């Protein structure tokens, strides 16, 4: 059966959702540590200290704070990302004057991923805002920046709507876009280059699960090394805006560098790097295999 664009988009969207779920389930505790260390670098001496304090203060559940919005965020982001990735690949083919079925180069795939990430950022920003606030609620309360309240997804959503209205969910959108667009160029670029390396002249579609996971891990490492300081500023804007009006990206960036130094922009890098390999490896493994399964069923139908 010949695939039409709507069916292809639905397959990419579903496979992206599977990838997003796998990413969260494998990497959530490290993401929680990352956000805590980015937003409150003075409270933690390092990853081990952050883990021990989180466990002593909140218990094991503290590592999984924000898992529900993280799942929603990653499913929404990766569904839109991979659906738009397929569409953007066609745009790149058209701009480059290629046939609709032509294989793109690794650089062209990276460009398509970068374009697709701009659309994904629009659905990611609101859910990531809720996730980041839930993950740092304990620190915000104990530092006196906000009053004690219920630490639930719904309480955070109601607080945002009450204070800022629907547009409040887009605190940090500019920094999210600044992270996503260049970041996903390196993400897809690193992934595709790694797949080309492991394929060694064979078709990339023939790669097994281990090369796929390693390629996904390389893509994740490339993304975070390229844009980590931007992500740090994004986390601060989204979390600290809980206590009142927060400065924009440029002013927040200048304040952090001036008052805390350049190294503050890399707070939480270690858990991010540890998380990048398994989480992004699982993402691409789930995406590629679920997509292949659905494509095979479609062709057999």
Swiss-Prot record:
Belongs to the mitochondrial carrier (TC 2.A.29) family. Keywords: Disease variant, Membrane, Mitochondrion, Mitochondrion inner membrane, Repeat, Transmembrane, Transmembrane helix, Transport. GO terms for cellular component: membrane; mitochondrial inner membrane; mitochondrion. It comes from Homo sapiens. InterPro entries: Mitochondrial_Carrier, Mitochondrial_sb/sol_carrier, Mt_carrier_dom_sf. Changing residue 179 to Q: Substrate specificities are markedly altered. Vmax value is 14-fold lower for ornithine as substrate. It catalyses: L-citrulline(in) + L-ornithine(out) + H(+)(in) = L-citrulline(out) + L-ornithine(in) + H(+)(out); L-ornithine(in) + L-arginine(out) = L-ornithine(out) + L-arginine(in); L-ornithine(out) + L-lysine(in) = L-ornithine(in) + L-lysine(out); L-lysine(out) + H(+)(in) = L-lysine(in) + H(+)(out). This is Mitochondrial ornithine transporter 1. The gene is SLC25A15. Solcar repeats lie at residues 7-91, 104-197, 207-293. Inhibited by pyridoxal 5'-phosphate as well as by mercurials (mersalyl, p-chloromercuribenzene sulfonate, and mercuric chloride), N-ethylmaleimide and spermine. The keyword Metal-binding does not apply. PANTHER family: MITOCHONDRIAL BASIC AMINO ACIDS TRANSPORTER-RELATED, MITOCHONDRIAL ORNITHINE TRANSPORTER 1. GO terms for molecular function: antiporter activity; L-arginine transmembrane transporter activity; L-lysine transmembrane transporter activity; L-ornithine transmembrane transporter activity. The keyword Membrane applies. It is a multi-pass membrane protein. Gene3D superfamilies: Mitochondrial carrier domain (1.50.40.10). It is found in: Mitochondrion inner membrane; Mitochondrion membrane. Changing residue 15 to V: In HHHS; abolishes ornithine/ornithine exchange. Highly expressed in liver, pancreas, testis, lung and small intestine. Lower levels are detected in spleen, kidney, brain and heart. The chain crosses the membrane at residues 5-25, 68-88, 110-130, 168-188, 207-227, 237-257. It is linked to Hyperornithinemia-hyperammonemia-homocitrullinuria syndrome: An autosomal recessive disorder of the urea cycle characterized by onset in early life. The acute phase of the disease is characterized by vomiting, ataxia, lethargy, confusion, and coma. Chronic clinical manifestations include hypotonia, developmental delay, progressive encephalopathy with mental regression, and spastic paraparesis with pyramidal signs.
């Amino acid at each position: 059966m010949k695939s039409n664009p709507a069916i292809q988009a639905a397959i990419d969207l579903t496979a992206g959702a599977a990838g997003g779920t796998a990413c969260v389930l494998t990497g959530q505790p490290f993401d929680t540590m990352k956000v805590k260390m980015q937003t409150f670098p003075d409270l933690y001496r390092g990853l081990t200290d952050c883990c021990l304090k989180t466990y002593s203060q909140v218990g094991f559940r503290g590592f999984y704070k924000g898992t529900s919005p993280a799942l929603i965020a990653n499913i929404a982001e990766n569904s839109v990302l991979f659906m738009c990735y397929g569409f953007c690949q066609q745009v790149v083919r058209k701009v480059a004057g290629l046939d609709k079925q032509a294989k793109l180069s690794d650089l062209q795939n990276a460009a398509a991923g970068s374009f697709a990430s701009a659309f994904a950022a629009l659905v990611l920003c609101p859910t990531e805002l809720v996730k980041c606030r839930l993950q740092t609620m304990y620190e915000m309360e104990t530092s006196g920046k906000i009053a004690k309240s219920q630490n639930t997804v719904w309480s955070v959503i109601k607080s945002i709507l009450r204070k800022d209205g629907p547009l409040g969910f887009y605190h940090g959108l500019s920094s999210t876009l600044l992270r996503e667009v260049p970041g996903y160029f390196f993400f897809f670029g690193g992934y595709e280059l790694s797949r080309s390396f492991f394929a060694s002249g064979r078709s990339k579609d023939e790669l097994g699960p281990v090369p796929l996971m390693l390629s996904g891990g390389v893509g994740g490492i490339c993304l975070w090394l390229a844009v980590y300081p931007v992500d740090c500023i994004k986390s601060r804007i989204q979390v600290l805006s809980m206590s009142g009006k927060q400065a924009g990206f440029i002013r927040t960036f200048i304040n952090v560098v001036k008052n805390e130094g350049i190294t503050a922009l890399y707070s939480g890098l270690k858990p991010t790097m540890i998380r990048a390999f398994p989480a992004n490896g699982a993402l691409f493994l789930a995406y590629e295999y679920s997509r292949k399964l659905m494509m095979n069923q479609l062709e057999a139908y």
